[in-house]
Structures are given as structure tokens and as C-alpha cells.
Regions:
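Conserved class I S-adenosyl-L-methionine
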Residues: 59-68
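C-terminal lobe and adjacent flexible extensions of AdoMet/dcAdoMet transferase-like proteins
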Residues: 249-270
């Protein structure tokens, strides 16, 4: 009887922890820290479902690679700020960097100061060719990157991709999770399209992750969009929110919506 009671208690605690994590993600997604403009894109980016799929919990150390202006950071930081840690592996900048990169990093760091919305968050640097120490080795429970792999491939090819996934593997604890969301190129498409379209083949990303030592644990269709053919005049930027063709066929591309995206969960072996 005592053993049964212990099992029931353990199961109850497990369910409670799951609900607590879900509630933390939901609360963060609906928080006032996020602008209404940011929340409007939840229709396409599905942050709550995506982060639950990856297994985000409040006590985790989470590294977000290339967080940009902080669309996902608003949610991630809010979830882990009390019990865990948020690390932003932002752009690497030096004297030769563009003003955009410099301003982006400076603006993000300003938000980590006392009294600001990411107070206490850590900012590191990432570049697939110049800066690979995104966090202390073996310190992260989770590494996440959203719609960035195509940039590294277009800028640095296979070497850049291998360096990136190697850096993610190094930063994670054994058993840690790598979550990747990326614009998906059909497997039947010419591989050359990855060089300029902004879309990547799922098989290519899985192979790159496995080469670094990861195991594919699961995939999700939560960010899939079957209306997106991935064949557009200006690549993925033809679609919203960019709408690179501006008024040309605007209604057509708005009707398609944002891109079809793969959502992949990898694990670093124990």
C-alpha cells in the first residue's frame, strides 16, 4: 500500500509539473511584456505549441541563438526568469560589422540592464565562423533557433552549418534538447534552391545535426503550412511578413500566409 501511495504521489507530481510548465508558457505568451503586434503573429508562429513540443520548463537554462529583436525572447525569458536562466547568443560584432548588427546587439543588451524587461539575462555572441562559444560547455538544458539555419547556410555553406551544430552540441548538457524551426524546402526540389530561397531541406538539417552527434527525437507539424509551395519569385521573403514584391500579388501571398516550417526536436545523448 505504501509503495502504491508513493507511485500515485510521483505520478501526481509529474502531472502537476507538466501543467505548471504549460501554464508558465501560456502566461508568458499572453504577458504584457509582448506587444500586440508580436501577439498577432502567434497565428503563424504558434509559440505556445512549439515550446511545449520542445519541452520547455521554468527551471531550464535556455540558449536562444540569433534572437533578433526578441520576439521569442519575450516568451522564453518570462518562462525561465525565476527558476532558470535565459541566454541570448546574439550577433557577433567587431569593427567591420554592419550598423544593423551593432545596433541590434546594443539594443538587446540595453534590455538586460536592471529594471529593463530582460533584466539579468546573459548575452553571448554567435557567428558560425568567428564565435562558437554560445554558453559554457555542458551548461544548457535547451538550445533553440528559429528560422536562422538558412542564413548560416547562405552565408557560409556547409562549413558554417557544421560549425553551428557543433557549437550547439557543445553547449548542451547530456540529455539536452536542440529545437529547430526552419522554412522547409520540399525534398523533391533542387538542392541549389537552398543557396538563395531561404528554404532548407529537412533531410539536410537532420543530417547536419546527426553529424554533430544529435539524435532526432521527434518532429511536429505545428508550424506547417500546406499552402506554401516554397517556389516564389523572391524566395521565402515573397510571403508575409516581408512581402518583398510589395503590392504585386499582395492578396495572393497574404492568402498563403507565412512559410511552411519544419519543427524538429533533437537530443544530445546521455
Amino acid at each position: 500500500m505504501k509503495k502504491l501511495a508513493q507511485l500515485v504521489l510521483a505520478a501526481t507530481l509529474g502531472v502537476t509539473a507538466t501543467y505548471a510548465s504549460a501554464d508558465a508558457i501560456s502566461d508568458a505568451a499572453m504577458s504584457d511584456i509582448r506587444s500586440e503586434k508580436a501577439k498577432a503573429r502567434d497565428e503563424y508562429r504558434h509559440p505556445q505549441q512549439t515550446l511545449r513540443f520542445f519541452g520547455l520548463k521554468p527551471d531550464m537554462t535556455v540558449v536562444e541563438v540569433s534572437p533578433g529583436g526578441g520576439w521569442y525572447a519575450d516568451i522564453l525569458y518570462s518562462v525561465v526568469k525565476e527558476e532558470g536562466k535565459y541566454v541570448a547568443a546574439h550577433f557577433y560584432v567587431d569593427d567591420s560589422s554592419s550598423d544593423y548588427y551593432k545596433k541590434s546587439v546594443k539594443g538587446f543588451k540595453e534590455k538586460t540592464k536592471p529594471g529593463m524587461k530582460y533584466e539579468g539575462a546573459e548575452v553571448t555572441a554567435f557567428d558560425p565562423m568567428k564565435a562558437l562559444d554560445i554558453a559554457k560547455a555542458g551548461s544548457a538544458d535547451m538550445v533553440l533557433t528559429f528560422r536562422n539555419v538558412h542564413n548560416w547556410y547562405m552565408g557560409h555553406g556547409e562549413e558554417g552549418i557544421n560549425n553551428a551544430f557543433g557549437a550547439f552540441f557543445k553547449a548542451l548538457k547530456p540529455g539536452g534538447v536542440l529545437g529547430v524551426v526552419e522554412h522547409e524546402l520540399p525534398e523533391s526540389a533542387d538542392v541549389e534552391a537552398m543557396k538563395k530561397s531561404g528554404y532548407m531541406k529537412r533531410s539536410y538539417i537532420i543530417a547536419a545535426a546527426e553529424k554533430a552527434g544529435f539524435m532526432l527525437e521527434a518532429s511536429s507539424d505545428v508550424n506547417a503550412n500546406p499552402m506554401d509551395t516554397a517556389d516564389h519569385p523572391r524566395g521565402v521573403w515573397t510571403l508575409p511578413p516581408r512581402l518583398a514584391l510589395e503590392e504585386q500579388d499582395r492578396d495572393k501571398y497574404l492568402a498563403i500566409g507565412e512559410s511552411n516550417r519544419m519543427t524538429l526536436k533533437f537530443k544530445k545523448p546521455n
